[in-house]
């Protein structure tokens, strides 16, 4: 798993560029992140009743459901800075979700083929979030502030 990390990072960059081109409404993305959480809940329900699987499953459950919950909060942000900060949390939670999925696969507690769609969805959500943060930061730098006007 660790040897191919450089390749996965390169794949994420390519994926991020593709995903940034796609236009998705706030409501569509809210639904997508919600469904991602639902799919992870279903996956964790099927984990064996071993201690390690249960502990990792709970971690996975927390961070995967936090993706949608925190995106919902970001969509209601009061300022661009607030949006960027909340989207940063979404990014962290999504990345942590992918980490726990990799851990479960490496420990052979879940089948890599069975979780492939879920990992793909997680990577796509992560790419969208990263692209959104970059766009918001770029727009924040170019924004004209009312106090700057003469």
Name what the model sees in each region.
Residues 1-150:
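Short, C-terminally biased terminal segments at protein or domain edges
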């Amino acid at each position: 798993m660790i040897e191919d990390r450089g390749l996965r990072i390169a794949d994420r960059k390519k994926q991020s560029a593709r995903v940034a081109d796609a236009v998705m409404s706030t409501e569509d993305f809210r639904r997508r992140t919600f469904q991602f959480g639902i799919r992870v809940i279903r996956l964790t329900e099927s984990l064996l009743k071993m201690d390690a699987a249960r502990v990792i499953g709970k971690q996975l459950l927390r961070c995967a459901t936090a993706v949608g919950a925190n995106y919902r909060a970001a969509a209601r942000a009061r300022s661009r800075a607030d949006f960027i900060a909340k989207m940063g949390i979404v990014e962290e939670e999504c990345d942590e979700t992918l980490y726990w999925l990799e851990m479960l696969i490496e420990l052979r507690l879940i089948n890599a083929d069975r979780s492939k769609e879920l990992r793909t969805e997680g990577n796509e959500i992560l790419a969208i979030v990263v692209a959104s943060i970059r766009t918001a930061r770029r727009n924040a730098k170019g924004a004209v502030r009312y106090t700057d006007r003469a």
